[in-house]
Amino acid sequence: WIMGHMVNAIAQIDEFVNLGANSIETDVSFDKNANPEYTYHGIPCDCGRTCTKSEKFNVFLQGLQKATTPGDSKYQEKLVLVVFDLKSSSLYDNQASDAGKKLAKSLLQNYWKNGNNGGRAYIVLSIPNLAHYKLITGFKETLKTEGHPELMEKVGYDFSGNDDIDQVAKAYKKAGVTGHVWQSDGITNCLPRGLDRVRQAVANRDSSNGFINKVYYWTVDKRSTTRGALDAGVDGIMTNYPDVIAVVLSESAYKSKFRIATYEDNPWETFKN
C-alpha cells in the first residue's frame, strides 16, 4: 500500500492517486464536544508541505465517497484504503467513546450512505493515544445500534503513538479487538528514525501468536529510506511523494517481491509468503 500522506482537501485525492497512491491518510480534528470537525493537520507539519489545507469533515467524506464508488464520475479504482489520523489528543480521555460514536455516525451518513451503495474503501481508524481505546468501542457500538454492524468488516485499527508493542496489545485487549490491526511506526519527514521498532512489529506480525496483521512506516520521501522499509518487510509506506515509492517498487530487487495492492487484497489478512 502506497499511502498518500496528509490528504485533507478533496482536490488532493485525485492528485495523490494520480501519482501512484492506492491509499490516503487524512487528518481529522475534533471540536470540544468530540464531534469530528475538519480534515486538518495544522502547523507544524512535514517539511515541504502546506499544513493548512482543510475541508469540513462531512464534506470531505462526501468527496471521498464519490472517489471510491464504482460508476461515479469521480471514481478512482485504485484507491482502496483510507487511514483517518484521528487528532484525538485535543480531547479529554473520557471523551474518546463519544468521539468514536460521532465519527461512526458521520461515516455512516456521509461515506457509507447508510449502507446504500456508499464508498467501498477499507478504513483504518488511527488513534494517537492508547488511553483512547474506547474510541473503538464507541464506534463499534454505534454501527450496531444504527443497524449496520456488517460495516465493521471494512474497518481496521492503528495506534500511532510509537508505543511499546506489548502496551499496544493490552489496549486492543481492553477494546475487544482481535483482528484488522495495522501497526504504524514513524516520524515526520523532517527527522530521521531507525527501523528497530518496525522490525519488532514485523516480527510480531509474522509470529504464530502475534496480534498485528499489517505494518506501515511513515513518512518516507526518499528512495534510500523506501528501500530500507521494504527490506524490513513492511506492508505499507506513507509518503508525500507516491511516485518515489512507485519507482523503487519497480526496481529489479523489489518488483518480484512486492506489488501494489488492489481492492481484491484483504488489508486485514496477514500476508503469507
UniProtKB/Swiss-Prot annotation:
GO terms for biological process: killing of cells of another organism; lipid catabolic process. One of its GO terms (cellular component) is extracellular region. GO terms for molecular function: lyase activity; metal ion binding; phosphoric diester hydrolase activity; toxin activity. It catalyses: an N-(acyl)-sphingosylphosphocholine = an N-(acyl)-sphingosyl-1,3-cyclic phosphate + choline; an N-(acyl)-sphingosylphosphoethanolamine = an N-(acyl)-sphingosyl-1,3-cyclic phosphate + ethanolamine; a 1-acyl-sn-glycero-3-phosphocholine = a 1-acyl-sn-glycero-2,3-cyclic phosphate + choline; a 1-acyl-sn-glycero-3-phosphoethanolamine = a 1-acyl-sn-glycero-2,3-cyclic phosphate + ethanolamine. Its cofactor is Mg(2+). The keyword Disulfide bond applies. Keywords: Cytolysis, Dermonecrotic toxin, Disulfide bond, Hemolysis, Lipid degradation, Lipid metabolism, Lyase, Magnesium, Metal-binding, Secreted, Toxin. It comes from the Eukaryota. It is an enzyme of class 4 (lyase). The active site is at 5, 41 (nucleophile). Its EC number is 4.6.1.-. Mg(2+) binds at residues 25, 27, 85. Binds 1 Mg(2+) ion per subunit. Disulfide bonds join 45-51, 47-190. Signal peptide: none annotated. It is found in: Secreted. Expressed by the venom gland. Belongs to the arthropod phospholipase D family. Class II subfamily. Dermonecrotic toxins cleave the phosphodiester linkage between the phosphate and headgroup of certain phospholipids (sphingolipid and lysolipid substrates), forming an alcohol (often choline) and a cyclic phosphate. This toxin acts on sphingomyelin (SM). It may also act on ceramide phosphoethanolamine (CPE), lysophosphatidylcholine (LPC) and lysophosphatidylethanolamine (LPE), but not on lysophosphatidylserine (LPS), and lysophosphatidylglycerol (LPG). It acts by transphosphatidylation, releasing exclusively cyclic phosphate products as second products. This is Dermonecrotic toxin LdSicTox-alphaIB3ai. The lineage of its organism: Eukaryota, Metazoa, Ecdysozoa, Arthropoda, Chelicerata.
